[in-house]
């Protein structure tokens, strides 16, 4: 047993220039781990609390000095002396210390930074790559990536309501090939947008953010870009999209209010619109199609589309086993998005992935729109054999860092590496 001997946190910046928490953990046998916490723009109201200072004289109130002080003070005092390899004890100690159901006292950003840095320190001490330390000898599945190539909603300053339009190289034979296919399609898409006189400025996650005439036009453009890049839509590269519908849902009128076409939709009308898109285009995955609190709407949506498309709950489940359990019992969605900072510890993240798998749900490990150079999620997705990752486009170093780490992992695994592609969607029946 080797214990944690020191913990140090500091305020650093994320990919949007906003402050976030970085923590370092040291062990008595020389182990060292460092981790940086990401942050989201479109956040579920049930997420664990990201503690911000609120001091308008610093970073517009977005500073995280209080969270940093919590790490260097209370958390360090409680965690120093614990076995660095006992991840569950480390995480539970911080959860108990916080004492709130949403980590609102110490901050999920403070707690998560130590949770992740501790795992890295343990892996370092044992001389293991993080994915192998977390997943053991069975960690061997490389994820099928969701590459966010057109941004809308809160991730871009344009008139597209749907937040993310993604390509998924489901026909690739390896992660390396998937990255190449994605990059080639990304560059083809850029040329196509330039031909149309559209902007090729990129959004928070590295995708293009053109002003398009409605929410269907991105699908048309993506199909053309996939074909121009030399691939078959659906067979080689499928389409996924994230509505982030809570962001344009009016709680008073209970309508979905879209900017792109200036319309208001009931849940049933919006479901029908999405169903038409799924039937018309090679769509394999839909995320957050309805408001996070519209459980009955989600149930109806799942009944109508659940056998032919992956339905991912992000704001609905917020990586929380309580909400996921409710969804499983109700027959809501068939997949969960996994975001470390939605729940706040590595242990709870593993529990959510395990619960999803046991229920026949897929799990998609995800970045946040405010990212950093930290590549923990690349190791996490392989460690858990989750099979899918959502980590942005083929631009911006904060996104590319994860793809590069995945390629390193695939190389290290050698002949044992497995890329499942279309078979990552083990609960679907749609034929392309």
Swiss-Prot record:
Binds a second Mg(2+) ion via substrate during catalysis. (2R)-2-phosphoglycerate binds at residues 163, 339, 368-369, 390. It comes from the Bacteria. GO terms for molecular function: magnesium ion binding; phosphopyruvate hydratase activity. It is found in: Cytoplasm; Secreted; Cell surface. Keywords: Cytoplasm, Glycolysis, Lyase, Magnesium, Metal-binding, Secreted. One of its GO terms (biological process) is glycolytic process. Pfam families: Enolase_C, Enolase_N. The keyword Secreted applies. One of its GO terms (cellular component) is cell surface. Its cofactor is Mg(2+). Coiled coil: none annotated. It catalyses: (2R)-2-phosphoglycerate = phosphoenolpyruvate + H2O. Its EC number is 4.2.1.11. SUPFAM superfamilies: Enolase C-terminal domain-like, Enolase N-terminal domain-like. Its main location: cytoplasm. Pathway: Carbohydrate degradation; glycolysis; pyruvate from D-glyceraldehyde 3-phosphate: step 4/5. The active site is at residues 205, 339. NCBIfam families: eno. Belongs to the enolase family. Homodimer. Probably forms octamers. This is Enolase 2. The gene is eno2.
């Amino acid at each position: 047993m080797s214990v944690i001997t020191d913990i140090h946190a500091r305020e650093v910046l994320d990919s949007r220039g906003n402050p976030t928490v970085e923590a370092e953990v040291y062990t008595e046998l020389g182990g060292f781990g460092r981790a940086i916490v990401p942050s989201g723009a479109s956040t579920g109201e049930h997420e664990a609390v990201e503690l911000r200072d609120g001091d308008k004289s610093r970073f517009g109130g977005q500073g995280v000095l209080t969270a940093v002080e919590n790490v260097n003070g209370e958390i360090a005092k409680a965690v120093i002396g614990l076995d660095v390899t006992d991840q569950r004890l480390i995480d539970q100690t911080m959860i108990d210390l916080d004492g709130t159901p949403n980590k609102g006292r110490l901050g999920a950003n403070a707690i998560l930074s130590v949770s992740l840095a501790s795992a890295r320190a343990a892996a370092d001490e044992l001389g293991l790559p993080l994915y192998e330390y977390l997943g053991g000898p069975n960690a061997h599945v490389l994820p099928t990536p969701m590459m966010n190539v057109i941004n809308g909603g809160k991730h871009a300053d344009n008139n597209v309501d749907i937040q993310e339009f993604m390509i998924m190289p489901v026909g690739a034979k390896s992660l390396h090939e998937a990255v190449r296919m994605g990059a080639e399609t990304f560059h083809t898409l850029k040329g196509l947008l330039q031909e149309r006189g559209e902007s090729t400025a990129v959004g928070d996650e590295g995708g293009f953010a053109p002003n398009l005439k409605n929410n269907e036009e991105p699908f048309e453009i993506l199909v053309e870009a996939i074909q121009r890049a030399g691939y078959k839509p659906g067979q080689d590269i499928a389409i996924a999209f994230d509505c982030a519908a809570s962001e344009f849902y009016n709680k008073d009128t209970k309508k979905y209010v879209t900017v792109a076409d200036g319309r208001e939709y009931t849940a049933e009308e919006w479901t029908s619109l999405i169903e038409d898109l799924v039937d018309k285009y090679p769509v394999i995955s839909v995320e957050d199609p309805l408001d996070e609190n519209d459980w009955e709407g989600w149930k109806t949506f799942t009944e109508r589309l659940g056998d032919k498309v992956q339905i991912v709950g992000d704001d609905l489940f917020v990586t929380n086993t309580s909400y996921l359990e409710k969804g499983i019992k109700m027959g809501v969605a068939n997949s969960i998005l996994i975001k470390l900072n939605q729940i706040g510890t590595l242990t709870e993240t593993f529990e959510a992935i395990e619960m999803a798998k046991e229920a026949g749900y897929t799990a998609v490990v995800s970045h946040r729109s405010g990212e950093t150079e930290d590549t923990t999620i690349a190791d996490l997705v392989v460690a858990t054999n989750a099979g899918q990752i959502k980590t942005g486009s083929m631009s911006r170093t904060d996104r590319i860092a994860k793809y590069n780490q995945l390629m390193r992992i695939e190389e290290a695994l050698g002949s044992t590496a497995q890329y499942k592609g279309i078979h990552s969607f083990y609960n679907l029946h749609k034929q392309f």
